[in-house]
Design a protein with these regions (language model features):
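Short acidic, glycine/serine/threonine-rich loops at helix termini
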Residues: 74-78, 109-112, 206-208, 231-237, ...
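Helix-loop-helix junctions that connect adjacent transmembrane helices in secondary transporters/permeases
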Residues: 133-213, 379-456, 589, 665-679, ...
Length: 745
């Protein structure tokens, strides 16, 4: 087992707590204009005309722009348009953008923009959207992706089963819910567009803005200001906002800002995909799983964002961390006239894990086994073949479950405490890491180190610091390899003019991709210095970097002196690390493959207390066990788990951004019930270093695993307490109250 690394103070902590960090909404520019989107008020229809004269005549207005004012491309096929040209596909689509001297003036003028439409039939359910007579959002139909996974023969497996459980599950939309509002500033400067945008993928923003403005990418520079969280947001939304502000900036020649209120986020912003899942599983009397069959429908909303990768992932993970010989999974994603859905924390895992772990509990119950015993019997082990056909290695699911049993306690029987129903539930994690074979891009990341004459380092990477502590992680990795304290290492914000494209801070890939690239960059820096010392200073043998010193046997010098030797050789003072993920593949004909380069494993336990009168559910205890491979920063990892649990609690119990009839249920954060600190119980986090992670650092990601199985652990506890299965999220007051009332009849 690897030695646990020390806790590391975040490199941005002081600036954030003292208010020195500048977020996009804090940036000040002379002559700045404020922009406001005009939103459609129907879910589907033809846009016949937009009337802007009254808005243009309003006080303080500098311009009003429609899709006809976009000089370049209005994004890609089936992607969310910057502004609607001729067809409205979702309530909240952008019809026009107003630019004015103040936000108040922009808001007033936006209300003066009117438009003519011809309503069209709409569809709001993904299963209905795939029927032959459903209203079509696009000429080629409503199907986004059909993903099938097959192993063995499901019918044979069900014939072998003594017990079969069939259940139907539904999950809801939720928002990413970052504390910082979406905001962007675009400023024409020195013949280029400067874009100040908190985002997950700055190079994607550059691509979108350049295409919209008809400019080469070299004429658009995206710089990331301080960022207050993402959780799957600040991606597609950031691109649309940046493009709208850029179009206004191009036309006016002035800096333009766009900042969303929470009502705009709820109306137009990206949400988690709702799933409708039919799940069937069979087992023998001794508890052996024999077959799993899943049919799932994924609501992608009106536009293409991350629906393909979400649907693909959910199909791969549908069998959970369990050994089963016969599998038949079919997941279909469809366009609907709802708001579009994207890569909200976990994208696909939380939805399918809710179904899988619920059915595993029910199978155990019908077989008279404990949830522990049933899972232990069926957990994957090294050498097994997963449900999607991948040979498994470094499987630590069993170690995680056993540690959870020790920490949480073995007794899962429901009981009554102070007049309240108390249930205890568990869930197991099996999550593919990073992009996987379902994403048609090679997963890569780069980090560059510049060695300065005073022995300090400038580090750059295109992978965004979204608030998770990524820069602290890179500082720790480089500092440990070169023997330097954090104050000698400066990591610049992502800047497309000076960093290499390293993909998106998504899919829990930051630690794996940028972390490994940073380690490789540090090795190259050491090799350059070592070569100089061997050739020019007579060092002979291994060289050690520690505490700001460079040692070789009895020889010793400061790191600064060693850098000076390198400088005097005339060699490059830069080191670059480039990391590429191991190849994955998917056989579309056989419906199986080597799907992800590695898998994250974990197990969670939840205790839930339910008031039998009101139906209110409170999580009173939560234990999260995760295998990290190797822990780089213990404190940051514990923090990620705590945040992930809080997001999972909201997903399980309160949050709901569903859109009945295309109208978002919650209009603002007063009616969208995010959990607060008062709604959270203490989270007991246990971090293991069992299974080997991704080399060379041997690490696993944690951002999304921390959330993925929280909801099923909670709902399994609630189902035990209520004596009835929770099959719909959120398990809110109304849901619980209905179960309690039904049991009284």
């Amino acid at each position: 087992m690897a030695q646990r690394e020390q806790d590391i103070l975040r490199v941005d902590a002081r600036d954030k707590v003292t208010g020195r960090t500048k977020y996009a909404a804090d940036l000040v520019f002379d002559g700045i204009l404020y922009t406001k989107s005009v939103h459609a008020d129907l879910p589907h229809g033809k846009l016949l005309a937009v009337h802007t004269a009254a808005a243009l005549a309003a006080e303080g207005v500098a311009g009003v722009y429609t899709a006809r004012d976009i000089p370049g491309r209005n994004v890609g096929d089936n992607e969310k348009p910057i502004m609607v040209y001729d067809t409205i596909r979702s309530r909240g689509d952008c019809i026009a953008v107003v630019a004015a001297v103040s936000q108040e003036a922009a808001d007033r003028a936006a209300r003066l923009v009117t438009y003519d439409t011809q309503p069209m039939p709409a569809v709001f359910d993904p299963e209905e959207a795939l029927l032959p007579d459903a209203p079509k959002l696009y000429d080629d139909g409503n199907l986004i992706l059909e993903h099938r996974v097959r192993k063995g023969w499901a019918a044979k497996g069900f014939d072998e089963a003594d017990i079969i459980v069939e259940r139907e599950f539904r999950t809801q939309r939720v928002i990413p819910g970052a504390i910082e509002p979406e905001s962007v500033v675009v400023s024409p400067q020195d013949g280029e567009l400067r874009v100040y945008c908190p985002c997950k993928a700055p190079f994607n923003i550059r691509r979108i803005v350049a295409a919209a403005c008809g400019l080469p990418m070299s004429a658009v520079r995206v710089t990331q200001p301080g960022m207050g969280g993402s959780f799957g947001g600040k991606d597609d939304d950031a691109g649309a906002m940046a493009a709208r502000a850029a179009i206004a900036a191009l036309h006016t020649g002035r800096p333009c800002r766009m900042t969303w209120r929470s009502s705009e986020t709820l109306l137009e912003g990206v949400k988690r995909h709702p799933f409708h899942i039919y799940y069937k599983a069979g087992a023998k009397r001794d508890g052996t799983l024999t077959a799993i069959e899943v049919r799932g429908f994924v609501d992608g909303g009106a536009y293409l964002s991350k629906s393909k990768t979400t649907t693909w992932r959910s199909g791969i993970e549908a069998t959970g961390p369990y050994r089963v010989e016969h599998v038949d999974v079919c997941m279909k994603a469809a366009y609907t006239n709802n708001c579009y859905a994207g890569s909200v924390r976990g994208f696909g895992s939380p939805q399918i894990d809710f179904a899988t772990e619920s059915v595993m509990d029910e199978l155990a119950q019908q077989l008279g086994m404990t949830p522990w015993a049933f899972r232990e019997k069926n957990l994957l082990r090294d050498g097994d073949i997963s449900g999607s056909g991948q040979p498994m290695r470094d499987v630590s699911a069993g170690a995680c479950l056993e540690r959870l049993r020790r920490e949480f306690g073995e007794d899962l029987r429901p009981f009554v405490r102070n007049g309240k129903l108390v249930g205890r539930g568990i869930a197991c994690l099996y999550r593919g890491e990073s992009y996987g074979a379902g994403t048609p891009v090679q997963d890569t990341s780069g980090v560059t180190i510049v060695l300065n004459a005073d022995g300090s380092l400038n580090v750059s990477t295109g992978l965004s610091e979204v608030g998770q502590g990524g820069h602290t992680l890179l500082t720790a990795i480089i500092g440990r390899e070169l023997g330097l304290p954090p104050e000698r290492i400066h990591i610049a914000p992502a800047d497309t003019d000076y960093c290499v494209d390293s993909g998106s801070t998504a899919a829990s890939r930051g630690t794996i991709t940028a972390g490994n690239a940073a380690w490789l960059a540090a090795q190259e820096a050491k090799q350059q210095i070592n070569t100089a010392l061997w050739e020019y200073r007579g060092f002979d043998g291994p060289i050690v970097y520690e505490d700001g010193l460079v040692r070789c046997g009895d020889e010793q010098m400061t790191f600064t002196e060693a850098v000076g030797v390198l400088r005097n050789t005339g060699r490059d003072m830069r080191a670059h690390g480039w990391w590429a993920a191991p190849k994955t593949f998917w056989d579309r004909e056989k419906c199986r493959g080597s799907n992800y380069m590695s898998y994250a494993y974990g197990a969670c336990g939840a205790e839930v207390e339910i008031d039998p009168i009101t139906g209110k559910a409170d999580v009173t205890d939560f234990v999260a066990v995760h295998d990290m491979g190797r822990i780089i920063n213990h404190a940051a990892t514990v923090g990620q788990v705590g945040g992930g649990v809080s997001m999972g609690v909201g997903y399980a119990l309160t949050e709901n951004a569903d859109t009945p009839g295309g109208v978002t249920r919650a209009a603002d954060l007063d009616s969208y019930l995010l959990p607060t600190a008062l709604d959270m119980c203490p989270v007991r986090t246990v971090l293991l270093e069992e299974g080997a992670g991704v080399p060379p650092l041997l690490v696993h990601g944690i951002g999304e695993p921390a959330t993925s199985i929280v909801a099923p652990a909670i709902t399994n506890a609630m189902s035990a307490a209520l004596g009835a299965r929770i099959d719909t999220l959120p398990a809110d007051l109304e849901t619980v109250r209905a179960i309690l009332d039904e049991k009284k009849r």
